[in-house]
Structures are given as C-alpha cells and as structure tokens.
Curated annotation (Swiss-Prot):
Keywords: Nucleotidyltransferase, RNA-binding, rRNA processing, Transferase, tRNA processing, tRNA-binding. InterPro entries: ExoRNase_PH_dom1 (IPR001247), ExoRNase_PH_dom2 (IPR015847), ExoRNase_PH_dom2_sf (IPR036345), PNPase/RNase_PH_dom_sf (IPR027408), Ribosomal_Su5_D2-typ_SF (IPR020568), RNase_PH (IPR050080), RNase_PH_bac-type (IPR002381), RNase_PH_CS (IPR018336). This is Ribonuclease PH. Homohexameric ring arranged as a trimer of dimers. Its EC number is 2.7.7.56. The gene is rph. The keyword Cytoplasm does not apply. HAMAP family: RNase_PH. One of its GO terms (biological process) is rRNA catabolic process. Phosphate binds at residues 91, 129-131. It catalyses: tRNA(n+1) + phosphate = tRNA(n) + a ribonucleoside 5'-diphosphate. Belongs to the RNase PH family. It comes from Burkholderia pseudomallei (strain 668). It comes from the Bacteria. It is an enzyme of class 2 (transferase).
Amino acid sequence: MTNSSLRPSGRRADQLRDVRITRHYTKHAEGAVLVEFGDTKVICTASVAERVPEFLRERGQGWLTAEYGMLPRATHTRSDREAARGKQTGRTQEIQRLIGRALRAVFDLNALGPRTLHLDCDVIQADGGTRTASITGAFVAAHDAVTKLVAAGRIARSPITDYVAAISVGMFGGTPVLDLDYDEDSACDTDMNVVMTGAGGFVEVQGTAEGAPFSRTEMNALLDLAQAGIGELVRLQRAALEA
C-alpha cells in the first residue's frame, strides 16, 4: 500500500501512530508512565510490595502481576465502572493476564526476590490498541521500579532480561497494516496482536479472522510487519529510559 488515503488515518501501511512515552507521570508509584499510541492514552504504574502470593511462600522468588481497566468515558460512550457492576468482564481479565504474561517473559523472578511487582494499566482514552500500548508502557514503568530497587540495595541486580513490547496488525482493505486504530480495527478482515522481546523472540500471537479467513502468506506478512513495528517500539522504549 503506497496510497496513504487507503487508511482512514492517512498513514502508510507500515507506519506506527505517533508514539510517546512519558516517564515519572505520577509521583507516588515506583514507576509511572503515560504511553500514547496516537489518541490511545494509558497510564501504567509499577508498585512494589514486600510480599508474594501464597503459592510462592518459602520459595524465595518474586512475582509480577497486572491489572487493567478503562475510565468510564475512555470510549465514545460512557460505560459503567466494573467496580460498580461488581464484576470484571472477560475482556478485562484476558487483557490483564496478557500483560502479566508478557512482562514475566522478560523477568528473572528469582532475582526479584520475595516481593511482588504490581502493574496497573488504566486507559484514559481508547482509540484501538489499548492492550498493546499497555504492555509497551508497563515495561518502561517496571524498568523504572526495579532500577529504584537496585539503587536502594533491595535487590542485587535487575531482574529484567530483555525488552518487551507489543503491537497490533491486521488485514485492512486486503492489505497488511500496522498499529490499527479504532476505525481500522472495526473494519479489518483480520486482527492480530503480537508481543515480542527486544531480541526478536515471540511471547504471544493472538490472531482472529474477523471477516474472510487469512492465508499463511498473509499471516507471515503480518508477523513481518509486527516485528518491524516492535523493533521501533523497543527503540522508543530505550530512548525514553535513557532520557
């Protein structure tokens, strides 16, 4: 796709939205990041607790877990808070488990010691790709948190073994495109979320045919596109952490 008008956003097929990572966004959490993928904005915080879940007692290793939520008016119409409904949706549970799995893939939990790193991802504005933005921002928040643990002498070394980031790809108008916004996500034939490490290893691939089935050739093209996009996201993570 060379004609940018084929995408509602006017972007090239292989072009990310404008991605911004703002560290130290709030003052209380050990790590706090505002991550923006275009009009999708997520606050990601990392908090350290000197305890572990019951199933890890006496093992000496740590744990990392995540929670995810959306503000009532993060979308076009208001939705009730899940706390008011008294129950999390299946979507919320799925996304927060994904965030936790993604981050644990690049953590040495033994090096973290007997403590828990809580990652909270709160969507303040949604325009597609909230889970991928959450993973990308949560990594930076987690990095800041463990850097403080090392500096304070609470752990001997960083438990982080690699970078991790995530991006969406999809078949839109018969063409593989990168980083779908809401308009594209709502109209695409295939929607795929890809999580990868900085070294290029796959952590998770979630792909669904929303319309027409996709071929192996199309899947390979989508994965290639995702890999290139995640490489750019990792570069942005590094730049943010070095700033």
